């Protein structure tokens, strides 16, 4: 299902996430091309988020203004199967707001030093986030080098910064989010339930 009036649906859910706050500091944000799928206790929304970037140039006594757009496809999952501590995971080449502005702290894994070569992980509850990011999840994330992820309560947000997905890539993009959700479910029983939800959601997304 596509909803061109995306802002009222999406913005209240994402307005506390860092990537939204960081983008909105520069310019108003536009949401478009919303696709949703829902089954039981799980809902996923995939949408494009864009904001204009203004460059002021001066050549001699003349000045001009160039405007281009920063765009990316974002996935947002809301599920009662998730109960996440607040965290954000960003690739090393991504520059967002300082974690100190959100009272967040760096989360490190002394037994897995290679992880820091791929990502920067922050959270309010370091021990809770560290327990959540077990070796299986860290390995999966390193194979997805470049993904950006935020979690909070029953919400999970993910994207590949500055990357717009083509229509032919959306099915894979859905799957990336569902796989992350499955790995972030805290117990094996939850993971099995989530896996069933994923299969149903993928089926509905194909039909939409």
Residue ranges, per PLM feature:
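Charged, low-complexity intrinsically disordered regions
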Residues: 3, 7-208
């Amino acid at each position: 299902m596509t909803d061109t009036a995306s802002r009222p649906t999406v913005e209240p859910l994402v307005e506390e996430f860092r990537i939204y706050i960081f983008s909105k500091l520069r310019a108003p944000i536009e949401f478009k091309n919303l696709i949703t799928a829902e089954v039981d206790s799980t809902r996923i929304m995939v949408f494009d988020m864009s904001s204009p970037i203004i460059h002021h140039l001066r050549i001699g006594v003349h000045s001009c203004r160039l405007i281009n757009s920063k765009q990316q496809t974002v996935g947002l999952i809301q599920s009662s199967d998730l109960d996440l501590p607040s965290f954000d995971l960003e690739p090393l080449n991504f520059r967002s707001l300082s974690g100190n502005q959100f009272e967040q702290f760096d989360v490190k894994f002394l037994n897995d030093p290679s992880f820091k070569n791929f990502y920067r992980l922050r959270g309010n509850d370091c021990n809770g986030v560290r327990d959540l990011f077990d070796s299986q999840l860290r390995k999966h994330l390193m194979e997805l080098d470049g993904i950006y992820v935020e979690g909070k309560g029953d919400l999970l947000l993910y994207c590949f910064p500055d990357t717009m997905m083509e229509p032919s890539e959306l099915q894979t993009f859905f799957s990336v989010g569902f796989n992350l959700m499955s790995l972030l479910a805290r117990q094996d029983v939850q993971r099995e339930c989530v896996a069933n939800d994923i299969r149903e959601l993928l089926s509905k997304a194909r039909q939409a």
